[in-house]
């Protein structure tokens, strides 16, 4: 009897702990396997929770592969209402504003959320002798670089699963698209994978036999709100006819919110009724149809979508982009003390930055149109990832993560060695030395003939304006001389330029008197000329000797004593005469002070001889 005894183990607050665990997993983003897109923003969730809370989602998820992360696009559903519904399904309660309550209830009824709506299907009104829908005609097609899927609106609500192989030799890679409509809202949209180089190639879409019409959905890649348009259903008839919509009636302008889409149908709207039709597409019997330029122009106005491609693996791949993972990790979530008030942060609802114009959806009847797409990841001309749905305005963590990822992707150039180059503020070119020397030689008024004096060491010094200059350097045909004056260890900075014949001032001004004597110079001076004649006496001395010879010839007849006396007087007169009589500019010695000293010394020597 002891073996038959059983113990009852009870977990207190099991339901609360279980729902709290689901909500915590949602807040952290753990094990999420489905994304719900509404108004260009994405809400991540778990298939299990959605299937338990809604027969609509249960039927949808059982028809799609379970090892992939599905993305469901919901038309005619606001992002705020979807967010509140997710909160209600995970927590069991939600706070909704009064003005948003009608949209919330209508969305819950369309999605068949338990606890908010009656899940019993609405009775279908009988149709008047409508022929039963025939089996769909399956047409195999191959997906090229550019794939266009055109479908026309259908009167009855349904959803379709379509699996397409890419035909590139990879057996493991396939593309699955699921189109769901819960009402009879007639719509016409297009799915296209854009590539400019193959814009002319398009694939004929599946065509059903008489009694059925096809539906299509659009996966946009540009961030614009879905345009809502009113559809005009026609009166019902005995048979369902295929309606052809013209370009002018069926084109939806993404920039004009007042555009209405006209479509002609013959079936009555039946909400909450779902008809499943499956079509298998193979890549072996694909047919490519070349369309004329006129047909291409007619279809340019239709909307085109690019399905995302993700790798299919045996096990679910929950790895996300590093930018999204970093953004989810850094997000902060607010939790109250009571579990019923727990809410998750808006970081889970990201906006599609790269999303295009969403398809216009029908608002009548409270219907909802959803699209689920699963694709294979490949390197194409345009790469698509989950980061394209990131809302930079709402989620700061994801934005910072994306910025860090893009910064790491950009390569930093290597740092160069050596001293960094400094920018020169003055970009004007400096004049060259030769140009300066040539400009100095243009001053003819201040120039003088070149006169040199020999030195005791065999060198020469230039005489200019009574000052002596020593040779400094030579540039081309020009020689530069610097003043020889030196006092207290400081040299005079005056320099002159000589072109071998004349001397020109170059730079600087004298701040000293002329030198009284220079022991290094000899009394002989010379000027460079063609004959190279060197004069040992100065012009003043030559004039003095000429005057004395004339006086001696005139007084030869007089006595020697008187002659000597007269010579002495003549010498004095002749010595004073050059000072009184002005001489020509060419005969005047520039160094007058030195000549005076020399004349006095010469007079003293003559007196000693006598």
From Swiss-Prot:
Species lineage: Eukaryota, Metazoa, Ecdysozoa, Arthropoda, Hexapoda
Sequence ranges of Pro residues compositional bias: 122-135
Ranges for region Interaction with Chi: 1-308
Record keyword Zinc-finger present: yes
Residue ranges with Low complexity bias: 136-156, 401-410
Record field: compositional bias (Basic and acidic residues): 312-325, 422-432, 578-595
Record's comment describing the protein's domains: Homotypic interactions mediated by the BTB (POZ) domain of this protein may promote the clustering of distant insulator complexes into nuclear insulator bodies.
Function: Component of the gypsy chromatin insulator complex which is required for the function of the gypsy chromatin insulator and other endogenous chromatin insulators. Chromatin insulators are regulatory elements which establish independent domains of transcriptional activity within eukaryotic genomes. Insulators have two defining properties; they can block the communication between an enhancer and a promoter when placed between them and can also buffer transgenes from position effect variegation (PEV).
Domain BTB: 32-98
Outcome (variant: residue 92 to S): In allele mod(mdg4)351; embryonic lethal
Ranges of biased composition (kind: Polar residues): 222-238, 386-400
Modification sites for Phosphoserine: 230
Biological source species: Drosophila melanogaster
Residue ranges of the region described as Self-association: 1-160
Acidic residues bias: start-end ranges: 567-577
Region (Interaction with su(Hw)): 551-610
Coiled-coil intervals: none
GO cellular component: chromatin; nucleus; polytene chromosome; polytene chromosome band
Subunit structure: Can self-associate. Interacts with Chi. Interacts with Top2. Isoform mod2.2: Component of the gypsy chromatin insulator complex, composed of Cp190, mod(mdg4) and su(Hw). The gypsy chromatin insulator complex interacts with Topors via mod(mdg4) and su(Hw). Isoform mod2.2 interacts with Trl/GAGA and interaction with this protein may bypass the repressive effects of the su(Hw) insulator.
SMART domains: BTB
Name of the molecule in the record: Modifier of mdg4
GO process terms (BP): apoptotic process; chromatin organization; germ cell migration; male meiosis chromosome segregation; male meiosis I; meiotic chromosome condensation; oogenesis; regulation of chromatin organization
């Amino acid at each position: 009897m002891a073996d038959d005894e059983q113990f009852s183990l009870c977990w207190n607050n099991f339901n609360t702990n279980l729902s709290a665990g689901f909500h915590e997993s949602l807040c952290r983003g753990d094990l999420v396997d489905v994304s719900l897109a509404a108004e260009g923003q994405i809400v991540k969730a778990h298939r299990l929770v959605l299937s338990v809370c809604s027969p609509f989602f249960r039927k949808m998820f059982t028809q799609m592969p379970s090892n992939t992360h599905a993305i469901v696009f919901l038309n005619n559903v606001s992002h705020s209402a979807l967010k509140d519904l997710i909160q209600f399904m995970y927590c069991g309660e939600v706070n909704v504003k009064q003005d948003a309550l009608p949209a919330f209830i209508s969305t819950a009824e369309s999605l068949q959320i338990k606890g908010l709506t009656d899940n019993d299907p609405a009775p279908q009104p009988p149709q008047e002798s409508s022929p039963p829908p025939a089996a769909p005609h399956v047409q195999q097609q191959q997906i090229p670089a550019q794939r266009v899927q055109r479908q026309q609106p259908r009167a009855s609500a349904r959803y379709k699963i379509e699996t397409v192989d890419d035909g590139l030799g990879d057996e493991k890679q396939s593309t699955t698209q699921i189109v769901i409509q819960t009402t009879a809202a007639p719509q016409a949209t297009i799915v296209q994978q854009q590539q400019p180089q193959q814009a002319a190639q398009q694939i004929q879409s599946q065509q059903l036999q008489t009694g059925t019409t096809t539906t299509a959905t659009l996966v946009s890649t540009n961030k614009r709100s879905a345009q809502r348009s009113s559809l005009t259903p026609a009166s019902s008839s005995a048979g369902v006819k295929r309606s052809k919509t013209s370009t002018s009636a069926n084109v939806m302008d993404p920039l004009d919110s007042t555009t209405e889409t006209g479509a002609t149908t013959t079936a009555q709207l039946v909400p909450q009724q779902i008809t499943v039709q499956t079509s298998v597409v193979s890549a072996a019997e694909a047919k490519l149809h070349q369309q004329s330029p006129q047909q291409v122009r007619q279809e340019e106005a239709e909307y085109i979508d690019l399905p995302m491609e993700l790798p299919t693996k045996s096990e679910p791949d929950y790895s996300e982009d590093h930018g999204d993972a970093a953004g989810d990790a850094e997000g902060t979530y607010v939790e109250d003390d009571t579990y019923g008030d727990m809410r998750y942060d808006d970081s889970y609802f990201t906006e599609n930055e790269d999303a295009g114009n969403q398809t216009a959806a029908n608002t009548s009847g409270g219907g909802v149109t959803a699209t689920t797409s699963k694709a294979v990841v490949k390197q194409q001309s345009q790469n698509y990832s989950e980061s394209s749905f990131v809302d930079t305005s709402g989620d700061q963590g994801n934005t910072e993560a994306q910025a860090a990822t893009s910064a790491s992707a950009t390569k930093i150039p290597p740092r160069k060695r050596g001293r960094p180059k400094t920018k020169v503020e003055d970009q004007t070119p400096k004049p060259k030395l030769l140009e300066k020397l040539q400009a100095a030689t243009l001053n003819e008024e201040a120039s003088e003939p070149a006169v040199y004096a020999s030195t005791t060491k065999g060198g020469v010094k230039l005489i200019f304006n009574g000052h002596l200059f020593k040779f400094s350097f030579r540039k081309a045909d020009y020689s530069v001389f610097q003043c020889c004056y030196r006092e207290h260890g400081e040299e005079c900075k005056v320099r002159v330029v000589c072109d071998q014949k004349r001397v020109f001032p170059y730079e600087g001004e004298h701040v000293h008197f002329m030198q009284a004597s220079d022991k290094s110079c000899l009394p002989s001076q010379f000027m460079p000329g063609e004959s190279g004649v060197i004069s040992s006496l100065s012009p003043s001395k030559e004039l003095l000797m000429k005057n004395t010879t004339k006086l001696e010839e005139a007084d030869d007849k007089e006595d020697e004593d008187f002659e000597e006396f007269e010579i002495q007087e003549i010498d004095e007169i002749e010595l004073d005469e050059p000072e009184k009589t002005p001489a020509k500019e060419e005969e005047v010695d520039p160094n007058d002070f030195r000549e005076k000293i020399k004349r006095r010394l010469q007079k003293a020597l003559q007196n000693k001889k006598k």
